[in-house]
Structure formats: structure tokens, C-alpha cells
């Protein structure tokens, strides 16, 4: 019997069928589901994220879905903290945490840990907010561009939360947020290479995807078309009508949302929006495969197989997760 409690990772590219398999597993195992998806954390973003339906979530609850407003930011460190808390609660009930999703950075952060970012400093933050009031947010963004051009390129001038945090990190530590993240990545990669795990669980790693990449591309295109038929444009229109969201926010930069937003801005025709949305989703899947190829002890399942549940259960039994 393992000294550490069990956990299951169910990973894979977008449109591979992860959610359906996770639900099937939860029907026959003492599992509770935790979402590992950087877009599903946002409320009001249902169609474009292929979020499980309200009926599915009512019957098979997922932790870490609909926990944030789209105006907020969410980091890998935030996820790790939230996921560890959820896993501890699930384990305390005698159940198995089943983490399902495609945000591979989150899985890696959970498994191998992250170096700590500098803590918030109230005095520094107050000074930055005062500067913003006096000189405007663009002035702070210009400051960030000097000390951390990489962060400045990805943070919109109208995203005060992330802008202040990036400048705060630099002023408190003397290192840019980009440098800290590079350090985190290096330490996490070193931990992975050496087999050092920072997660107090015995983890079984499952991945699901079509064996033929062309099939995945077809599924991605079909799903994007279905999203449009289901009212994806209306969903983004509702987000725009709030007046406090913009294209620089992490939520709006999510695959699909960015392209629809640009279409509604008049930058893309509908056909261009659809084509670019599908291409962006395929590029996301390619990045996910790149992460998965380097993942150790990964058991693959074919999305098109009819017996994935029994195959998954057989594997979980073979690695003593179910003992």
C-alpha cells in the first residue's frame, strides 16, 4: 500500500474528450473532479471554453470552474494553491482527486512546484497607485516597458491589477517578473529532470487524444463551428457590453475569444475570425502535445476507442491507485 494518498491526472489536447472520460471515471470510482483549465475559471465564459453544461456540473461538480470574474487574473501559483487545498479536502473525505484539463503549465506547477514570487508590499503598492492617479496608467506601463519589456508586451495598460503586480515585483526584489518566471521554469524543469516531485500524492498520469492528428483537427474545426451556432458571438457581446473588459485581459486573450473580440472590433470578417479561431486552437493543441511528449510515466488512450473507461481502470489498477 502506498504511503502517499492517490491522485489521478487526466490530460490531453483540446477537443480530445477529457471531460467525458473524467465523468465516466467519476461514476465508478470514489473520485471528485478538479478542473485544470486557465479559461474555465472564468464566469460568463461558457460556450467558447466548451465548459461542461450546467446539468453536468450539477451532477458531476468540478472544482475551480466559475471561480473568477473575467476582469481578474489567475496565475499558475494561484492554481497550485487552490488545487492543493481542494485535493486535501477530497482526500480527507476518503476520495481520490481527479484533475482533468489541458493547461499543462498548471499540471507542471502542481507536480513540481514553483519558486515563490516576492510577497505583496502595501507601501510599494500604495505608491504605485498614487503614481497612477497622478500620471495615468500609461505612465506606469511605460515604466514597466523599461525594466521588464516582456511583461509590458503581454500586460495591457488598462490592466491595473497585473501592471501594479509586475512593477511591485521589480521594486521589491530588484528582479523583473520575467526573470522570476524564468527562474521558476528552470527550477521546475530541474525538478522534473531529477524526478523530484513537490506533490504529496501518488499520481497516475492518463492522457487522451485521437491517434490520428487529422482527426483532432477535424474535431477542433467542428467544435468551433458548433460554438458559433450555440451563440459564441452573443456571449462575447455580453462580455463587451460590461464596459470594463478589454482585449489585453487574460480572459479575453483565451483562444477563440481573442478572435471573436477582434471580429466584433471590425478587425476581422466572420470568415477570417472562424479560420483564425480554428488555427489558434490547433496551435494550442500542438503546444499541449509538446508538453505531453516530455511527461514521464504517461499512459495514453485513443479518443476514438470504445473501451477507454475499462482501459483507464485497468491502468489505474496496475499502478495501485485503486488499492
Curated annotation (Swiss-Prot):
Residues annotated to bind substrate: 14-19
Domain of life: Bacteria
Site (Interaction with substrate tRNA): 103, 125
Annotated InterPro entries: Dimethylallyltransferase, IPT, P-loop_NTPase
Biological process according to GO: tRNA modification
Residue spans crossing the bilayer: none
Keyword list, A-Z: ATP-binding, Magnesium, Nucleotide-binding, Transferase, tRNA processing
Catalytic activity: adenosine(37) in tRNA + dimethylallyl diphosphate = N(6)-dimethylallyladenosine(37) in tRNA + diphosphate
Binding site for ATP: 12-19
Cofactor: Mg(2+)
Pfam family, one: IPPT
Single annotated GO MF: tRNA dimethylallyltransferase activity
Function as written in the Swiss-Prot or TrEMBL entry: Catalyzes the transfer of a dimethylallyl group onto the adenine at position 37 in tRNAs that read codons beginning with uridine, leading to the formation of N6-(dimethylallyl)adenosine (i(6)A).
Listed name of the protein: tRNA dimethylallyltransferase
Amino acid at each position: 500500500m502506498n504511503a502517499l494518498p492517490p491522485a489521478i491526472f487526466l490530460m490531453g489536447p483540446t477537443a480530445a474528450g477529457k471531460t467525458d472520460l473524467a465523468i465516466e471515471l467519476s461514476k465508478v470510482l470514489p473520485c471528485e473532479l478538479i478542473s485544470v483549465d486557465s479559461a474555465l475559471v472564468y464566469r460568463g465564459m461558457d460556450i467558447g471554453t466548451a465548459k461542461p453544461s450546467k446539468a453536468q456540473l450539477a451532477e458531476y461538480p468540478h472544482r475551480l470552474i466559475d471561480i473568477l470574474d473575467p476582469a481578474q487574473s489567475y496565475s499558475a501559483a494561484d492554481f497550485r494553491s487552490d488545487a492543493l487545498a481542494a485535493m486535501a479536502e477530497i482526500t480527507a473525505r476518503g476520495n481520490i482527486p481527479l484533475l482533468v484539463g489541458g493547461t499543462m503549465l498548471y499540471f507542471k506547477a502542481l507536480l513540481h512546484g514553483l519558486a515563490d514570487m516576492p510577497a505583496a508590499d502595501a507601501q510599494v503598492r500604495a505608491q504605485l497607485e498614487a503614481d497612477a492617479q497622478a500620471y495615468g496608467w500609461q505612465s506606469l506601463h511605460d515604466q514597466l516597458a523599461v525594466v521588464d519589456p516582456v511583461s509590458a508586451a503581454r500586460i495591457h495598460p488598462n490592466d491595473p491589477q497585473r501592471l501594479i503586480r509586475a512593477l511591485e515585483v521589480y521594486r521589491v526584489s530588484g528582479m523583473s517578473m520575467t526573470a522570476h518566471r524564468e527562474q521558476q521554469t528552470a527550477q521546475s524543469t530541474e525538478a522534473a529532470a531529477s524526478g523530484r516531485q513537490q506533490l504529496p500524492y501518488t499520481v497516475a498520469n492518463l492522457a487522451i487524444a485521437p491517434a490520428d492528428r487529422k482527426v483532432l483537427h477535424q474535431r477542433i474545426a467542428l467544435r468551433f463551428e458548433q460554438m458559433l451556432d450555440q451563440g459564441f458571438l452573443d456571449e462575447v457581446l455580453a462580455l463587451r457590453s460590461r464596459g470594463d473588459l478589454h482585449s489585453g485581459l487574460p480572459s479575453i486573450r483565451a483562444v477563440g475569444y481573442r478572435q471573436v473580440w477582434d471580429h466584433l472590433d471590425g478587425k476581422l470578417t466572420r470568415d477570417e475570425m472562424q479560420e483564425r479561431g480554428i488555427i489558434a486552437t490547433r496551435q494550442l493543441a500542438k503546444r499541449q502535445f509538446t508538453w505531453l511528449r516530455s511527461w514521464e510515466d504517461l499512459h495514453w488512450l485513443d479518443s476514438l476507442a470504445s473501451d477507454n473507461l475499462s482501459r483507464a481502470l485497468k491502468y489505474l489498477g496496475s499502478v495501485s491507485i485503486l488499492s
